[in-house]
Amino acid sequence: MNLFSSVQLAPKDPIFGLTEAYTADQRPGKVNLGVGVYYTDDGKVPLLRAVLEAEKEVVAKEAPRAYIPIEGPNPYNSAVQNLLFGKDSALIQAGRVVTAECLGGTGALRVGGDFVKRLEPNSQAAISSPSWENHRGIFEAAGYTVLDYAYFDPKTRGVDFDGMVKSLQSFPAKTLVILHACCHNPTGADLTKDQWKTIISICQQKQLIPFLDIAYQGFADGIEEDGAAVRMFADSGMSFFVSSSFSKSFSLYGERVGALSIVTQNKEESARVLSQLKRVIRTNYSNPPTHGAAIVATVLNSPKLRQMWEDELAQMRDRIKSMRHGLKEKLAAAGISHDFSFIEAQRGMFSYSGLTADQVAKLQEQDAIYALSTGRICVAALNSKNIDRVAQAIARVLMSK
């Protein structure tokens, strides 16, 4: 018997498969605008000074590599809660927030999805159209039927809010709705505070289950500003979920540092929720790793390192904004009649460029410039050395018949 004779070759991941093609490309001057990674102006993944200092402190302790609690270490989980909800949060003080360290934002989404599926076996999940490529796969793998809600208007390159409202109002009660808290991936189009108020009201009226995904806190306007949606949900009195990731904001991509936070109605409910959450984690990966979470906790719990980190994060944010402005200006200077103001208006690491799949293919074939077939480009991969070449190539494919 050949056990694996029926195994089919799986399609490559749209993002990491693109990176494989980019790595194999031997042409000089190649540019990878596909993967969601922040690069310095020298084209390198940064090692933040705050992270380096924290890691020195962690290593100096020479702590044994023993198992840590299923939900992760308390210093880390407390730091995550304070970052999301504020250190003076009434929810935290009332014991209404349960947090568990997870394997990146992806792990937090899956653990949260598994938890809800055990609680509500008939629940469906809903993601924005478009959304991060892995959202659909994560929740389908957790057993959900995945619905789509309207989000992006290709004409305005902004949020189709009327369509979003109509979609959410059509969903049955207990639908798990995945919401991008800031820096929407892939479009860069975010909701206003007034729009968030409407979404919260719909979730309450329709008894939807909000699941906020916040992977880019600090990349739009700042730590506090980018956490506004989470805190608005906190003020609503609803129970909800938050997936958070420190891959981007701490440049700790390979450490897989994330967290799942669940807001409950009271302290007693939190204890029951945590007990079941630990069961979900125990049968998945049992315990989380120590190193990445220890670094993040050390930074967030040290006033000096926290300020150093926020300063470095601000520098990353400002560089991305500078690249947005530069790309807009250079495309406009190329004499194309398009309105490129949307590039500067969009927020976070990505821009939904409007490039077609054929145009993206031409960029790859003719210029060794790699982007997703959806037209999503990572603005954080642009720098002073490649932005002219990228702008010229985009202008050429836009002008070609």
Would you name each region that the model predicts?
Residues A229-R272, Q276:
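Active-site PLP attachment segment
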Residues A94-R96, F342-G348, L372-G375:
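Short Gly/Ser/Thr- and Asp/Glu-enriched loop/turn motifs at secondary-structure junctions
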Residues I214-A215:
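Conserved Walker B
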Residues E310-E365:
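Conserved PLP-binding catalytic core of the aspartate aminotransferase-like
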Residues L274-A293, V299-K328:
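Structural signature of PLP-dependent enzymes
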Residues L52, E57, E62-Q205, G218-F219, ...:
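Conserved core of the PLP fold type I
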